[in-house]
Design a protein with these regions (language model features):
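Short, contiguous acidic and Ser/Thr-rich linear segments
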Residues: 22-32
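Residue-level "contact hotspot" at macromolecular interaction interfaces
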Residues: 27, 48-50, 78, 90, ...
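Short, charged beta-turn/beta-strand-edge "cap" motif at the junction between a beta-strand
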Residues: 91, 101-103, 146-148, 192-197
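Ferredoxin-reductase
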Residues: 105-187, 242-244
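Iron-sulfur (Fe-S) cluster-binding segments and ferredoxin-like electron-carrier domains
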Residues: 34-46, 56-103
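Short conserved beta-strand and strand-loop elements enriched in small hydrophobics
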Residues: 4-6, 97-100, 140-145, 186-192
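FNR/FR-type flavoprotein reductase catalytic core
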Residues: 161, 166-325
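Intrinsically disordered, low-complexity terminal tails and inter-domain linkers enriched
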Residues: 9-23
Length: 325
């Protein structure tokens, strides 16, 4: 039976480095999932997608103890340091685990702007302590303290200075309530940018079909702007569904962008119109690439209509996260 030696859990509510408390030895069943084991034993490891895409559940182990599958989606530097994704780790041997501590493992950033884009959507801009590399549409984990973190898509482009995020706020959410109490000048911590969901310069002559709901618009509009800035030549069609016509929180900015770029066309719709809209999807070309962003149920709802419209699975990229408040 594998044993997990957990070095300790950072103190909840503390944003600064210190000696972790609660060192623990856990006996686990062979083949059990490391994330599940840690959560069951009271360790507050952030998680979202459980597929390895969001990279929220990073923990560290001795490099020779890490199953290769638990590192497959990480970069070479992370792998060499023993970082792994707990959700992708099936336990087969003893492991020595250190939990992620944002104050020592991540990049500090100062909040430069906070304002509402809609009743429940907060624009958050932050200034990183130093420049960092990312692609428009990728995501990163934002930490408010040593145990409270969520992944968010980057809504800004490289070169725009501050990083921008669009946060859906939940009435009784732990992260939502905590971020409401923050103010400009406060510090949070940012993980590394991650994810395959971004514009590729090799797509210049490929028609793009961007489909999103809610704050899934954040990475999609960034990808559209990045493509246009890169001189994208083929059509870009952006569909967005919100709870009401007034809920497309970027309607004015997107309309202005479409006025400036003839290859960009917009369809800003409501959730009530989604089923009907999907029956009318048309592809500009068999070479079209579709990018989908939203809740898992929304992403799955789009797959069959896209297939029926003639789009093979290899031409569909998606970013689907389980929304955790």
């Amino acid at each position: 039976m594998p044993e997990i030696y957990v070095a300790g859990t950072p103190v909840a509510g503390s944003p600064v480095a210190g000696t972790p408390v609660g060192a623990q030895t856990i006996a686990a069943q062979p083949g059990s999932n490391l994330l599940d084991v840690l959560l069951e034993h009271g360790h507050k490891v952030p998680w979202s997608c459980r597929s390895g895409q969001c990279q929220s559940c990073l923990v560290q182990a001795r490099p020779d103890e890490v199953p290769s599958a638990a590192q497959a989606q990480l970069n070479a530097e992370q792998q060499s340091k023993g970082w792994l994704l707990a959700c992708q780790c099936q336990l087969q041997q003893d492991m020595h685990i250190s939990l992620h501590n944002p104050a020592t493992d991540d990049l500090p950033a100062r909040i430069s702007d906070m304002r509402y884009l809609a009743d429940d959507i907060l624009l958050l801009r932050v200034t990183p302590e130093r420049p960092l590399r990312f692609r428009a549409g990728q995501h990163m984990v934002l930490w408010l303290d040593a145990t409270l973190a969520r992944p968010y898509s980057i809504a800004s482009l490289p070169g725009e200075g501050d990083l921008e995020f669009h946060l859906r706020l939940h009435p009784h959410g732990a992260f939502s309530n905590a971020i409401r109490e923050r103010k400009t000048g406060d510090t949070l911590y940012m993980g590394a940018a991650a994810g395959h969901f971004h514009y590729d310069p090799g797509w210049q002559e490929t028609p793009l079909l961007l489909l999103g709901s809610g704050t899934g618009l954040a990475p999609l509009q960034a990808i559209a702007r990045d493509a246009l800035q890169a001189g994208h030549e083929a059509p870009i069609v952006l569909w967005h569904w919100s709870r009401s016509q007034a809920q497309c929180y970027l309607a004015d900015a997107l309309s202005e962008l479409a006025d400036q770029h003839s290859q960009l066309s917009l369809h800003l719709r409501t959730h009530a119109e989604l089923a009907s809209d999907l029956t009318q999807l048309r592809l500009a070309s068999r070479k079209t690439l579709a990018l989908l962003c939203g809740q898992p149920a929304f992403v799955e709802q789009l797959r069959k209509p896209l297939f029926m419209a003639g789009l093979p699975g290899r031409q569909i990229l998606d970013e689907a996260f389980i929304s955790r408040p």
